[in-house]
Swiss-Prot record:
Residues 172-344 are annotated as: Interaction with MAP3K12. The modification Phosphoserine is found at residue 91. Residues 314-329 are annotated as: Leucine-zipper 2. This is MAP3K12-binding inhibitory protein 1. Keywords: Acetylation, Cytoplasm, Isopeptide bond, Nucleus, Phosphoprotein, Repeat, Ubl conjugation. Residues 271-285 are annotated as: Leucine-zipper 1.
Length: 344
């Protein structure tokens, strides 16, 4: 059933009149709405005897201007009314697309079957043989290489033996270190054991680590030798530098050489506190892991630090000699008194 509506296409004169009679935005929007209706009829290819649109632009121009709010409300209601119809049209479109894809797939499968029917089984086997021969030729071309680039010239069995020997050697080294650092008592009767899991933590007094360390007071050390230490950046004459106190200078030199610190600069007033902190830090690091300072190696004989040369007068030398004689006499008298006291 066709619906007929009295609407004509606007002529050229009407279009000129339309351009002259646009007093406000609301009327312009209304003109565009009517023009879109005319475009819709053309897209659907409806003849004039089915749908006919006639617009009298003169009468439309003489009408009072529409309120924008009224026009907006009417247009919004019309769009909301048309949205359900769009949703209804989407489902048959999807079904048509699915059907078309299935038909294309069936056509392709039929073409493949026809091609397979044309070729016999023997032809297919020959084609597979040709492919295999091509693959063998490719492998042969890839095998050719320069033998000089090979670093290890040994068979697979020899390479596997070397790898297994390397793994066993590393495991033995790790096991030895674990037993030495973690395990206190080794149970020889136990077949399966692990030094780290079976270890008994025995904290040493005054230390936080399981590695036993001891504090040693050395009167002289490896840093007292005059020649420079390789890799430390010290000059041979760096040991002769004095900060005013021989004991402080020796401790400073030992710590700086052990930590590979650059010497120099003024000595602060809290020098003893700094030395104490540095020594405690070194002891803590060695207690956590002895490997911290294993790279530091020293060679040569240990030599005492030579005190700075001083010039004394004859009177000062006589005083020192007399003081030394008195000290020796005092020690000898004390030794004699102790010996007589212990006699029965």
């Amino acid at each position: 059933m066709a619906a007929a509506t009295e609407l004509n296409r606007p002529s050229s004169g009407d279009r000129n009149l339309e351009r002259r009679c646009r007093p406000n935005l609301s009327r312009e929007v209304l003109y565009e709405i009517f023009r879109s209706l005319h475009t819709l009829v053309g897209q659907l290819d409806l003849r004039d005897d089915v749908v006919k649109i006639t617009i009298d632009w003169n009468k439309l121009q003489s009408l009072s201007a529409f309120q924008p709010a009224l026009l907006f409300s009417a247009l919004e209601q019309h769009i909301l009314y048309l949205q359900p119809f769009l949703a209804k049209l989407q489902s048959p479109i999807k079904e048509e697309n699915t059907t078309a894809v299935e038909e294309i797939g069936r056509t392709e499968m039929g073409n493949k079957n026809e091609v397979n029917d044309k070729f016999s089984i023997g032809d297919l086997q020959e084609e597979e043989k040709h492919k295999e021969s091509d693959l063998r030729d490719v492998k042969k071309t890839q095998i050719h290489f320069d033998p000089e680039v090979v670093q290890i010239k040994a068979g697979k069995a020899e390479i596997d033996r070397r790898i297994s020997a390397f793994i066993e050697r590393k495991q033995a080294e790790i096991n030895e270190n674990n037993v030495r650092e973690f395990c206190n008592v080794i149970d020889c009767n136990q077949e399966n054991s692990c030094a780290r899991t079976d270890a008994i933590f025995t904290p040493y007094p005054g230390f936080k680590s399981h590695v036993k360390v001891s504090r040693v007071v050395n009167t002289y050390g490896p840093q007292t030798r005059p020649e420079g230490i390789p890799g430390s950046g010290h000059k041979p004459n760096s040991m002769l530098r004095d900060c005013g106190n021989q004991a402080v200078e020796e401790r400073l030199q030992n710590i700086e050489a052990h930590l590979r610190l650059q010497t120099g600069g003024p000595v602060p007033r809290d020098i003893y506190q700094r030395i104490k902190k540095l020594e405690d830090k070194i002891l803590e690091l060695e207690g956590i892991s002895p490997e911290y300072f294993q790279s530091v190696s020293f060679s040569g004989k240990r030599r005492k630090v030579q005190p700075p040369q001083q010039n004394y007068s004859l009177a000062e030398l006589d005083e020192k000699i007399s003081a030394l004689k008195q000290a020796l006499l005092r020690k000898s008298r004390e030794a004699e008194s102790m010996a007589t006291h212990h006699l029965p």
